[in-house]
């Protein structure tokens, strides 16, 4: 029984770790912002829709037609409420660095929920029905995401219209937002339970930099 109590205390300490000391940093925010924005754009990248621009004048001049997948409308729709998607992330306290932010329930929380289902009384300081609500860390991720996007919206637009040959993370984070800041988190890639940084060869994308799939985070 004593060992079981110690185990529970350890699990609680992972969940209730001092969140003020582990709020997301600029690199982590930038990384997740680009992951979500790229994912939103990828979902509409193959659209064959055509967008008509301008008004039909009395002169009979026709409205200009452009492809949706290269239009400003596509970018605007992708960016709309993009930071709301950050609220889908959970804190995986058992993972290192930026990998602690991922979608899906963490191993720690799964363990605690299984204990509850077995009739074990678990106290986390919040009602059970609120366990899946966004944490302080995730709420801060969203807030910083909104601020970052507002301050660097022109950089996103520049990439979209002129530099899509470069990866979004590389152009937005490395070359601009984090140009004079720590970029270590950009090299972190989830490799199963190990949570190790991928090697340079394994993590390279088409532009020579690591790519991230929103579904993997």
Swiss-Prot record:
GO cellular component: extracellular region
Protein localization: Secreted
Compositionally biased intervals (Basic and acidic residues): 205-217
Domain of life, source organism: Eukaryota
InterPro entries: DUF3456
Hydrolase found in the keyword field: no
GO molecular-function terms, A-Z: signaling receptor binding
Record bears the keyword Signal: yes
Keywords: Disulfide bond, Secreted, Signal
Disordered, as annotated region: 194-217
Disulfide bonds: 27-185, 30-173, 83-145
Recorded family membership: Belongs to the canopy family.
Protein name according to UniProt: Protein canopy 4
Species this chain originates from: Danio rerio
Underlying gene: cnpy4
């Amino acid at each position: 029984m004593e060992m079981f109590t110690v185990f529970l205390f350890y699990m609680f300490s992972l969940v209730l770790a001092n969140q003020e000391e582990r709020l997301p940093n600029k690199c982590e925010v930038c990384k997740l912002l680009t992951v979500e924005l790229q994912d939103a754009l990828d979902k509409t990248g193959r659209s064959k829709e055509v967008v008509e621009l301008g008004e039909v004048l009395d002169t009979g001049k026709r409205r200009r037609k452009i492809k949706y997948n290269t239009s400003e409308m596509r970018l605007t729709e992708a960016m709309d409420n993009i930071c709301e998607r950050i609220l889908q992330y959970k804190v995986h306290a058992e993972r290192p660095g930026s990998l602690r932010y991922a979608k899906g329930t963490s191993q720690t929380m799964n363990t605690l929920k299984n204990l509850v289902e077995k009739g074990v009384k678990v106290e986390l300081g919040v009602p059970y029905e609120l366990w899946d609500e966004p944490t302080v860390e995730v709420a801060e991720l969203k807030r910083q995401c909104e601020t970052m996007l507002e301050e660097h919206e022109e950089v996103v637009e520049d990439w979209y219209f002129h530099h899509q040959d470069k990866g979004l993370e590389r152009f937005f984070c490395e070359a601009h937002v984090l140009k004079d800041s720590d970029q270590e988190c950009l090299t972190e890639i989830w490799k199963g339970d190990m949570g190790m940084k991928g090697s340079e060869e394994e993590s390279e994308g088409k532009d020579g930099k690591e790519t991230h799939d929103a579904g993997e985070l």
